[in-house]
Each structure stands twice: as C-alpha cells, then as structure tokens.
Amino acid sequence: MIMKYVLAIDIGASSGRHIVGWMENGEIRTKEVYRFPNAITDQNGHLVWDTESLVSHVKKGILEAQMAYPVESMAVDTWGVDYVLMKGDKEVLPVYAYRDSRTEAAIPEVHGIIPFSELYRRTGIQFQPFNSIYQLYADKLAGRLEGVTDFLMMPEYLLYKLCGVKAKEYTNATTMGMVNAETGEIDAEIVSRLGLPQQLFPKLSRPGTVIGQYEGIKIALCATHDTGSAVEGIPMEGDDLYISSGTWSLLGVKTPKPLTDENSQAANYSNEGGVGYIRYQKNIMGMWLINELRRELCHEKNFGEIVKEAEKSTFDMTLDVDGPEFIAPKSMKAVFDAALKVPLTKADYFRCAYLSLAQSYRKAIEELEANTGKTYDKLYIVGGGAKNTFLNRLTREATGKKVIALPIEATAIGNLKIQLEGLENEQI
C-alpha cells in the first residue's frame, strides 16, 4: 500500500503550525515540520492582523513540508469570525481582529433592524460582540464596503493567496452569525434587511471539497474553523461532552439537528457547523485569562511553575470570567482586583483564575444538559489546556464528569482526517 501524506496548516491566535500526517496501522501519524508566531497588533488604536506575515509563514511551512515528505494535499484552518475584504485581487487594509472594539456602535443598529431573538431563531449562533455579522455592519457604517467585490474568511483568504480561488467553507461561515441553521446556507433575508451586498455571499462549500492546487499539491477544504476540525480530531465513543481548550474554551456536544429554542438562546449556546452534524457548543473563557495574568505578573515563569504555585495557594474565591470585562482589558490584574477587592499574592490570582474556569465549565454543562434533556458521563478535553493537570482535576471536581484529557493536536488531526478520508474515497 502506497503511503499518502497530507499537510494540515493549523493557525491559532498566538501561533501556527504545519503538521504532516499519514495513515499507519489504522492510526493517523503526525510530524510537525514548521511552527511560527502569530499575534494581534495595535495599529492606530485598533487591533489588527498582519496578513502579509501570515501568508509568508504559510508558504515557508509548505516548502519545509515538501522538502521532507511527498505531500499530496493540504488544508488550512484558523480561528473563526475574522475576514479580509477584497476589491478584486487587492486587500482592504487594515484587517481587523475580533478583539477590536469597532463593533460597539454596530451591535444596537443590527439588533434594531433584526432583533437578536429572531437572529438566533434563524441562525442558532450565540451572541458574541465580534461575530462577523457585526463586523460587516461596522464596515458598512464606516464606508469600507464601497467597491468591495468579495470578503474571505481568514483560512479561505490564505488559500486564495495560494491558488487564486475564492471559496467560502460551511463550518467557518457559521461563525458569522448569518448562516440559516436549517438550510446550511447564508440567510438571504438577513443579508437583505441589513443592506449588505448580496454578491458577497455565494453558495457555501463543504469540508472535503478540492478548490485548486499550489506547487503541485491539491488544496482542499477541511473544517476551516479550527474548532470544527478539533471536534473531528477527538476520538469520542458516542454522545460525549468536549472542551477544545485554547485561548477560548469551546464546550459542547454533537447533535443531529440545531437547537434554536429560547432556553438555548438564554444560555447563549451556538449551533455551529460540523462535518455532518451540528456542534451545539458555547464559547467561554479559556487560557486567555492565564496568558494575560502571566504576561502582566510573571512573564519570566513557565506555566509549570505557575501551576505548582497556584496549587499551593489556599485562595478559594471565584469570578464570573465570562463577562465582557475579561475579553480585552488593558490590565487583567486590574479586572481581578476590581471584582475581588481583597489583597492577593501572584499565586492567588492564578488559583482564582483556574477555579473560575472550572466553575464556568460546570455552569455551561448544567445548561447544556438541561437544554438537550440528556445527561453526559464523559468530558473530553483537547488543546493546549488539556496538558494542565491541575485545571483538569478542578474541572473533574466541579462537574462530576469523567475527564479524559488528550494533550493532542486535535485540530490538526481533524484537519488531516478529513483530507485522508477524502483521498481514501477518491474525493480529493
């Protein structure tokens, strides 16, 4: 049997990686061939992405992969909601990042035209101030849509820079808050009522679709939203809970159909696109909390040291860390201080953060079980946070679930799995 090699380009908010994968003895084997930093930068008071750097690193990593393996296909996944506006083949700069505050004025205007209760019934997507629907309306208010011929979600933009084909992939499109939950396509009435250009919203493509090639390598669509690929990469046995633990914690379960009822809306649950299923999940606070505290309090310490000190602390107060004040504060320490109003050691801040994350998970699971009418026994945790044994223990204690922590590159594995299955079925 001839070995088939595929390349996953998996890019998160703080780093990207190129991972080659192949099937061996019924299991996906992987080898990381390139890793690079990524970061939101401040430009004239706005938070933006350096897309030129991203494209450069993507191409460098592909070259490294080609030098080491006979790669047949590749796919890109990134975070959701962010996009690049295009005028023909030219980018409209800057490319704003989801943490920027530019949507503040757009949100009430959007909800004045389409109440959120109606948006939720149509799309099933939880309210987040950075959802693409609000970003696009902010662009409309700012006049940035004039002359725009297209917009590409971040992974599709990177693929366009490789092969010249403009695509819109289903799982990532659902993060926009504009895909109809029942039809799986862009809701034309939402587009019309908001006065957005209809030509920007063509039919969506599904994971497994080949859209072009680059340097002799087929370019395929995986679940281009990283969480969509991550859920594909979790070896769940059945109806199990999952947390994709990174900058954000994505907690959810697979469902055959969307749940867009009032209880799901009240709990702010999302119905995001999966590979043949719906990801009924909630976007809640994650390692962003820890990373920001570390940057401010003890950037010289590694996470292992921080965890050990947090375990020794006896601090037991918790915070609701899913409040808007935690999204992009100038000082995370100041947010904690304002809420707790007691003196803390550095270790206390981190213990409070870990305890609060575990309680956030507990609350989200209670809501999920009430809304689905099911009780779940197992909780799979993947992503960077899965390596944190202290947080895993706190999560087990808070939720009462059997926690199965898999410190694997679940997103890359899911990306690779979609490609390998496509090659096996001769769809790629």
PLM segments and residue spans:
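Short alpha-helix plus adjacent loop in nuclease-associated cores
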Residues: 100-113
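Active-site core segments that coordinate phosphate-bearing ligands/cofactors
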Residues: 7-8, 111-123, 137-149, 153, ...
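Short beta-strand-loop/turn "lid" adjacent to the catalytic site in phosphate-handling enzymes
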Residues: 63-98, 123-130, 159-180, 205-206
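Conserved phosphate-binding loops in N-terminal lobes of ATP-dependent enzymes
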Residues: 60-73, 129-141, 146-159
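Short beta-strand scaffold segments in enzyme catalytic cores
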Residues: 16-21, 82-86, 177, 229-233, ...
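N-terminal glycine/serine-rich phosphate-binding loop of ATP-dependent small-molecule kinases
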Residues: 1-93, 121, 147, 216-219, ...
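Short glycine-rich phosphate-binding loop at a beta-alpha junction
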Residues: 70-78, 371-384
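Short, well-ordered amphipathic alpha-helical segments that serve as non-catalytic structural scaffolds
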Residues: 53-66, 183-189, 360-365
